Amino acid sequence: YDHNLVLEDVSFHVHEDQFTGIVGPSGAGKTTLLRLLLQTLEPAAGTVWRAPDLRVGYVPQLESVSWNFPITVFECVLMSRKSSRLRPWASASEKASVSAVLDRLGIGDLGERHIRELSGGQQKRMFLARALLRQPQVLLLDEPTSGVDISTRHDILHLLADLHEDGMAIVLTTHDLNGIATHLPHLVCVNRQIVGEGTPHDVMTPTVLERTFGARMEVLEHLGVRLVVDEAPTPYTPGTRI
Protein backbone atom coordinates (compact mmCIF):
# COMPACT_ATOMS: atom_id res chain seq x y z
CA TYR A 1 0.00 0.00 0.00
CA ASP A 2 1.56 3.30 -1.15
CA HIS A 3 4.99 1.63 -1.20
CA ASN A 4 4.59 0.39 2.40
CA LEU A 5 5.46 -3.27 2.82
CA VAL A 6 2.60 -5.06 4.58
CA LEU A 7 3.54 -8.72 4.07
CA GLU A 8 6.71 -10.46 2.95
CA ASP A 9 7.94 -14.04 2.58
CA VAL A 10 4.44 -15.47 2.98
CA SER A 11 3.83 -18.99 1.72
CA PHE A 12 1.10 -21.41 2.77
CA HIS A 13 -1.66 -23.56 1.29
CA VAL A 14 -5.39 -23.69 1.87
CA HIS A 15 -6.61 -27.23 1.25
CA GLU A 16 -10.17 -28.18 0.43
CA ASP A 17 -10.72 -29.90 3.79
CA GLN A 18 -9.08 -27.23 5.95
CA PHE A 19 -10.41 -24.96 8.71
CA THR A 20 -7.75 -22.31 9.21
CA GLY A 21 -7.44 -19.34 11.53
CA ILE A 22 -5.09 -16.49 10.60
CA VAL A 23 -3.97 -15.06 13.93
CA GLY A 24 -2.20 -11.79 14.62
CA PRO A 25 -2.43 -8.29 16.09
CA SER A 26 -4.05 -5.30 14.42
CA GLY A 27 -1.98 -4.13 11.46
CA ALA A 28 -0.25 -7.50 11.06
CA GLY A 29 -1.55 -7.99 7.51
CA LYS A 30 -4.40 -10.43 8.19
CA THR A 31 -6.99 -8.60 6.07
CA THR A 32 -4.41 -8.02 3.35
CA LEU A 33 -3.73 -11.76 3.28
CA LEU A 34 -7.45 -12.47 2.87
CA ARG A 35 -7.67 -9.97 0.01
CA LEU A 36 -4.74 -11.68 -1.69
CA LEU A 37 -6.51 -15.03 -1.37
CA LEU A 38 -9.67 -13.41 -2.70
CA GLN A 39 -7.62 -11.95 -5.58
CA THR A 40 -8.99 -8.44 -5.10
CA LEU A 41 -5.42 -7.35 -4.38
CA GLU A 42 -2.35 -8.13 -6.46
CA PRO A 43 0.93 -8.93 -4.69
CA ALA A 44 3.90 -6.67 -5.47
CA ALA A 45 5.94 -9.84 -5.95
CA GLY A 46 5.17 -13.52 -5.99
CA THR A 47 2.06 -15.43 -7.02
CA VAL A 48 -1.29 -16.32 -5.52
CA TRP A 49 -2.56 -19.46 -7.23
CA ARG A 50 -6.21 -20.43 -7.07
CA ALA A 51 -7.87 -23.42 -8.68
CA PRO A 52 -9.80 -22.48 -11.84
CA ASP A 53 -13.55 -21.92 -11.34
CA LEU A 54 -13.17 -22.11 -7.56
CA ARG A 55 -16.18 -20.55 -5.83
CA VAL A 56 -15.01 -18.29 -3.02
CA GLY A 57 -17.26 -16.52 -0.52
CA TYR A 58 -16.13 -13.53 1.51
CA VAL A 59 -17.49 -11.96 4.69
CA PRO A 60 -15.62 -8.70 5.38
CA GLN A 61 -15.32 -7.25 8.85
CA LEU A 62 -17.31 -4.20 7.75
CA GLU A 63 -19.98 -4.63 5.09
CA SER A 64 -20.78 -1.73 2.76
CA VAL A 65 -24.50 -1.70 3.47
CA SER A 66 -26.52 1.48 3.99
CA TRP A 67 -28.39 0.81 7.22
CA ASN A 68 -30.92 3.53 6.44
CA PHE A 69 -31.81 1.99 3.09
CA PRO A 70 -35.38 0.62 3.41
CA ILE A 71 -34.74 -3.08 2.81
CA THR A 72 -35.47 -6.21 4.78
CA VAL A 73 -33.07 -8.97 5.76
CA PHE A 74 -34.52 -11.19 3.02
CA GLU A 75 -34.01 -8.48 0.38
CA CYS A 76 -30.47 -7.71 1.56
CA VAL A 77 -29.45 -11.36 1.21
CA LEU A 78 -31.28 -11.68 -2.11
CA MET A 79 -29.26 -8.76 -3.52
CA SER A 80 -26.10 -10.87 -3.29
CA ARG A 81 -27.33 -13.46 -5.81
CA LYS A 82 -25.20 -13.98 -8.90
CA SER A 83 -27.79 -12.73 -11.39
CA SER A 84 -28.71 -9.52 -9.53
CA ARG A 85 -26.87 -7.38 -12.09
CA LEU A 86 -28.28 -9.20 -15.07
CA ARG A 87 -31.94 -8.86 -14.15
CA PRO A 88 -33.61 -6.93 -11.34
CA TRP A 89 -36.16 -9.59 -10.46
CA ALA A 90 -35.53 -12.84 -8.61
CA SER A 91 -36.72 -16.26 -9.65
CA ALA A 92 -38.73 -18.53 -7.37
CA SER A 93 -35.72 -20.81 -6.95
CA GLU A 94 -33.50 -17.88 -5.91
CA LYS A 95 -36.05 -16.81 -3.31
CA ALA A 96 -36.25 -20.38 -2.06
CA SER A 97 -32.45 -20.45 -1.76
CA VAL A 98 -32.52 -17.29 0.37
CA SER A 99 -35.16 -18.79 2.66
CA ALA A 100 -33.12 -21.98 2.97
CA VAL A 101 -29.88 -20.22 3.91
CA LEU A 102 -31.64 -17.95 6.41
CA ASP A 103 -33.24 -21.00 8.03
CA ARG A 104 -29.89 -22.78 8.17
CA LEU A 105 -28.32 -19.84 9.99
CA GLY A 106 -31.20 -19.62 12.45
CA ILE A 107 -32.59 -16.28 11.24
CA GLY A 108 -35.43 -17.47 9.02
CA ASP A 109 -37.91 -15.64 11.24
CA LEU A 110 -36.07 -12.34 10.66
CA GLY A 111 -36.54 -12.25 6.89
CA GLU A 112 -39.11 -9.45 6.93
CA ARG A 113 -37.34 -7.37 9.55
CA HIS A 114 -35.57 -4.14 8.54
CA ILE A 115 -31.80 -4.58 8.55
CA ARG A 116 -31.22 -1.74 11.03
CA GLU A 117 -33.35 -3.58 13.61
CA LEU A 118 -30.85 -6.43 13.89
CA SER A 119 -28.50 -7.05 16.78
CA GLY A 120 -24.77 -7.37 16.16
CA GLY A 121 -24.93 -11.15 16.11
CA GLN A 122 -27.91 -11.15 13.75
CA GLN A 123 -26.04 -8.81 11.40
CA LYS A 124 -23.10 -11.23 11.34
CA ARG A 125 -25.44 -14.06 10.35
CA MET A 126 -27.08 -11.95 7.64
CA PHE A 127 -23.71 -11.16 6.06
CA LEU A 128 -22.74 -14.82 6.31
CA ALA A 129 -26.00 -15.66 4.53
CA ARG A 130 -25.07 -13.26 1.71
CA ALA A 131 -21.81 -15.14 1.19
CA LEU A 132 -23.39 -18.60 1.44
CA LEU A 133 -26.06 -17.81 -1.12
CA ARG A 134 -23.43 -18.22 -3.83
CA GLN A 135 -22.61 -21.73 -2.58
CA PRO A 136 -18.88 -21.19 -2.10
CA GLN A 137 -16.36 -24.00 -1.84
CA VAL A 138 -14.06 -21.79 0.21
CA LEU A 139 -15.31 -19.23 2.72
CA LEU A 140 -13.09 -16.32 3.84
CA LEU A 141 -14.16 -14.35 6.92
CA ASP A 142 -12.50 -11.26 8.39
CA GLU A 143 -12.91 -11.15 12.20
CA PRO A 144 -16.33 -12.89 12.09
CA THR A 145 -16.79 -12.78 15.87
CA SER A 146 -15.66 -9.23 16.61
CA GLY A 147 -18.13 -7.15 18.59
CA VAL A 148 -20.41 -10.03 19.65
CA ASP A 149 -21.07 -11.63 23.03
CA ILE A 150 -19.77 -15.02 24.14
CA SER A 151 -22.99 -16.88 23.29
CA THR A 152 -23.11 -15.45 19.76
CA ARG A 153 -19.41 -16.19 19.29
CA HIS A 154 -20.03 -19.84 20.16
CA ASP A 155 -23.03 -19.97 17.81
CA ILE A 156 -20.98 -18.58 14.92
CA LEU A 157 -18.15 -21.04 15.57
CA HIS A 158 -20.61 -23.94 15.59
CA LEU A 159 -22.16 -22.72 12.32
CA LEU A 160 -18.73 -22.55 10.70
CA ALA A 161 -17.83 -25.98 12.05
CA ASP A 162 -21.03 -27.39 10.52
CA LEU A 163 -20.17 -25.82 7.16
CA HIS A 164 -16.71 -27.34 7.38
CA GLU A 165 -18.20 -30.75 8.19
CA ASP A 166 -20.25 -30.41 5.01
CA GLY A 167 -17.04 -30.04 2.99
CA MET A 168 -16.46 -26.29 2.87
CA ALA A 169 -12.95 -24.93 3.43
CA ILE A 170 -12.95 -22.11 6.00
CA VAL A 171 -10.34 -19.37 6.49
CA LEU A 172 -10.94 -16.70 9.11
CA THR A 173 -8.88 -13.96 10.74
CA THR A 174 -8.88 -13.31 14.46
CA HIS A 175 -6.84 -11.84 17.28
CA ASP A 176 -8.95 -13.65 19.89
CA LEU A 177 -6.66 -16.38 21.17
CA ASN A 178 -8.76 -18.01 23.88
CA GLY A 179 -12.20 -17.45 22.38
CA ILE A 180 -11.43 -18.53 18.81
CA ALA A 181 -7.89 -19.58 17.93
CA THR A 182 -7.45 -22.32 20.50
CA HIS A 183 -10.57 -24.11 19.18
CA LEU A 184 -9.48 -24.22 15.52
CA PRO A 185 -7.68 -27.22 14.01
CA HIS A 186 -5.13 -25.19 12.01
CA LEU A 187 -3.54 -21.81 12.74
CA VAL A 188 -1.29 -19.44 10.81
CA CYS A 189 0.34 -16.81 13.05
CA VAL A 190 1.09 -13.61 11.14
CA ASN A 191 2.96 -10.42 11.91
CA ARG A 192 3.91 -9.05 8.48
CA GLN A 193 5.24 -12.53 7.77
CA ILE A 194 4.32 -16.04 8.83
CA VAL A 195 5.63 -16.54 12.35
CA GLY A 196 4.22 -20.02 12.92
CA GLU A 197 1.85 -22.55 11.39
CA GLY A 198 0.26 -25.71 12.71
CA THR A 199 -2.17 -26.92 15.34
CA PRO A 200 -2.88 -24.82 18.46
CA HIS A 201 -0.54 -27.16 20.35
CA ASP A 202 2.20 -26.41 17.79
CA VAL A 203 1.95 -22.62 17.63
CA MET A 204 0.32 -21.45 20.86
CA THR A 205 3.63 -21.33 22.68
CA PRO A 206 5.22 -18.40 24.54
CA THR A 207 7.92 -18.05 21.88
CA VAL A 208 5.62 -17.99 18.85
CA LEU A 209 3.04 -15.75 20.54
CA GLU A 210 5.68 -13.22 21.61
CA ARG A 211 6.98 -13.06 18.03
CA THR A 212 3.40 -12.67 16.79
CA PHE A 213 2.02 -10.12 19.25
CA GLY A 214 5.19 -8.51 20.60
CA ALA A 215 4.22 -9.29 24.20
CA ARG A 216 5.26 -11.95 26.68
CA MET A 217 2.48 -14.44 27.38
CA GLU A 218 2.00 -17.50 29.52
CA VAL A 219 0.34 -20.58 28.05
CA LEU A 220 -1.70 -22.86 30.29
CA GLU A 221 -3.45 -26.11 29.46
CA HIS A 222 -6.86 -27.08 30.81
CA LEU A 223 -8.80 -30.17 29.72
CA GLY A 224 -6.60 -30.44 26.65
CA VAL A 225 -7.20 -26.83 25.57
CA ARG A 226 -4.45 -24.22 25.55
CA LEU A 227 -5.22 -20.90 27.24
CA VAL A 228 -3.16 -17.73 26.98
CA VAL A 229 -2.70 -15.11 29.71
CA ASP A 230 -0.51 -12.03 29.92
CA GLU A 231 2.69 -12.80 31.73
CA ALA A 232 2.75 -11.00 35.09
CA PRO A 233 0.14 -8.37 34.18
CA THR A 234 0.41 -5.05 36.01
CA PRO A 235 -2.43 -4.81 38.54
CA TYR A 236 -4.77 -1.86 38.14
CA THR A 237 -5.68 0.25 41.16
CA PRO A 238 -8.84 2.35 40.79
CA GLY A 239 -8.06 6.04 40.68
CA THR A 240 -4.63 5.60 39.10
CA ARG A 241 -3.73 6.65 35.60
CA ILE A 242 -2.79 4.02 33.00
Report each predicted region and the residues it spans.
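Conserved ABC ATPase "signature" region
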Residues: 78, 92-110
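ABC ATPase nucleotide-binding domains
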Residues: 206, 211-242
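Catalytic Walker B motif of ABC-type/P-loop ATPase nucleotide-binding domains
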Residues: 139-142
